[in-house]
């Protein structure tokens, strides 16, 4: 029995050894587990990579870019020398407001918003009541002054000359702007400097074949308005000096109503060429590139005008000098306030104001007279 037990135990031991030798090692079957995690991470990582490109850091500029930060509202604190409140019915009272007329030399919607902000701010500063209106044409603003339906105006340069000659309107402030220029401008080194003058530019559709004044014959042409200095009066003088009769040499002409409208018409091919202020194509207030991103490529400049004194603010001659003084003070205060600056920038791209004497435009008027231009004959 004992011998049989010994033999049985020996057989069991041999059987275990055989099984052990035939079975795969435990470490060999578990080794893939150790190598699998890196394999899974490596193959899945590319599918998760777009998360990095969608990170908030790359989206932030489109959500809230610094340039879109709204400007602060204008500070309209009451002026120290504000006049006493007018009696009912007097000029400046609620039922007889001081009317400010603005010429439609740009986007009338933007002009209306900015003009309303100016009227409201002057009301708070002076204790007087102001009301704004945008003329349907340049001439409409002039005639409102002549009829004393408006007492304050923001006219362009030539309209100021007309209003001076016809109704005795006097300039009080001239606009100071960062000088806009282009590559053809002899004064391009002044670009960005604050100056009381500007220039006009002749533009053409890039596909029109126009590169000089001589090429304009037989083409269609867009002006701004018959009372626009850089968009009509001065360009006509220059056209005639370069052998182009603006009344006979074009296949068609039209008055587009504003400088941005001229640029848009040329861009769309409604006019082969036209004239605007420098440089309406990239002007911040006109903001044409927001609607037509390629406008500077499809519209080309081929000539520029001489210097033209800037526009500004004027008064009718019968307005009380004390009221004139306080209005000037209020406008200068707005021009020195960040919120006020933003309003003036949106209005007509003003950067600042400079007080001027009544004879400020006399030299320019003399140039026009020498060229045979009589402002009194051009009131439309």
What are these regions (language model features)?
Residues 37, 60, 68-117, 319-380:
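An extracytoplasmic/periplasmic, membrane-proximal ligand-sensing/linker region
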Residues 163-190, 246, 284-302, 371, ...:
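Ligand-binding "clamshell"
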Residues 157-168, 235-241, 267, 272-296:
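A ligand-binding cleft/hinge motif common to bilobed small-molecule-binding domains
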């Amino acid at each position: 029995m004992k011998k049989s037990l010994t033999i049985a135990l020996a057989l069991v031991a041999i059987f275990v050894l055989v099984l052990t030798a035939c079975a795969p090692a435990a470490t060999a079957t578990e080794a893939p587990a150790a190598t699998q995690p890196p394999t899974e991470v490596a193959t899945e990582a590319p599918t998760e990579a777009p998360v990095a490109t969608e990170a908030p850091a790359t989206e932030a500029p489109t959500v809230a870019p610094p340039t879109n930060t709204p400007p602060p509202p204008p500070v309209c604190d009451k002026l120290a020398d504000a006049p006493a409140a007018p009696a009912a019915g007097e000029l400046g009272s609620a039922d007889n407001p001081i009317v400010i007329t603005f010429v439609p030399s740009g986007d009338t919607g933007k002009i209306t918003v900015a003009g309303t902000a100016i009227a409201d701010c002057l009301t708070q500063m002076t204790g007087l009541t102001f009301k704004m209106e945008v003329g349907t044409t340049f001439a409409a603003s002039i005639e409102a002054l002549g009829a004393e339906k408006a007492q304050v105006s923001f006219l362009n340069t030539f309209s100021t000359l007309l209003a001076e000659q016809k109704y005795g309107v006097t300039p009080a402030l001239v606009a100071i702007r960062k000088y806009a220029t282009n590559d053809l401008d002899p004064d391009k080194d002044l670009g960005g400097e604050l100056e009381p003058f500007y220039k006009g530019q002749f533009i053409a559709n890039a596909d029109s074949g126009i590169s000089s004044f001589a090429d304009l014959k037989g083409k269609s042409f867009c002006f701004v308005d018959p009372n626009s200095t850089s968009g009509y009066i001065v360009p006509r003088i220059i056209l005639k000096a370069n052998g182009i009769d603006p009344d006979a040499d074009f296949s068609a002409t039209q008055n587009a109503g504003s400088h941005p409208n001229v640029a848009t018409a040329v861009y769309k091919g409604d006019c082969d060429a036209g004239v605007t202020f420098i440089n309406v194509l990239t002007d911040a207030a006109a903001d044409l590139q927001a609607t037509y991103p390629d406008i500077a490529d499809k519209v080309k400049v081929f000539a520029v005008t001489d210097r033209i004194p800037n526009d500004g603010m004027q008064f009718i001659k019968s307005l009380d000098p004390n009221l004139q003084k306080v209005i000037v003070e209020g406008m200068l205060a707005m021009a020195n306030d960040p919120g006020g600056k933003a309003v003036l920038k949106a209005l007509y791209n003003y950067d600042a104001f400079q007080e001027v004497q009544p004879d400020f435009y006399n030299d320019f008027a003399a140039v026009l007279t020498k060229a045979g231009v009589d402002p009194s004959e051009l009131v439309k």
